[in-house]
Amino acid sequence: IREPHFFHGKNAFTYFIPKTFDYFLQAKKLGMTFKAPKPDPINQNMLTGKISNKQPFIFDLCHLGQSMCKKNLGIEFAYEISNSIFGGKKDWYKDNHLFSICSKLGVDLEEMRNFTKLNEKEIIREIENNQIEQLAIGHHGVPLTVYKNNFFFGQDRFDNLIDELRKDGLKYN
């Protein structure tokens, strides 16, 4: 979405199928379920890589996620919604699924939507600033964590991030 030119020349055979297979293998290694999202949060033609101008899910999802960050529930929300999206939950975006996730986190979906709407400009500005900071560190992919000017992209480097945090005193089981 942010970098549509990234997908120029990529297609199902040269990019999407190998990436999906890699995601599946990584999930299997971690004992996690991985299934193709139904629907995918990003509306994109997997044969051509072209990103659609119509995006019914990703912006609301990102705004809700940023709102959860403001409530100190960002990681928990990301965990729950990712498991829903990539764990085979059909129609993950529908209210019954989102209500369930919010309830598990101890928040009300409607209150979060109202909070998001009231703070939309600030939330968008925060997301844009995050994108600027990602590019400044030398990466634009997601999920991405930056710690001490080093980026940790995707699930493959999560253990490296935890090791760095532990060196600095993080207590983590």
Predicted regions and their residues:
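C-terminal cap of thioredoxin/glutaredoxin-like
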Residues: 76-173
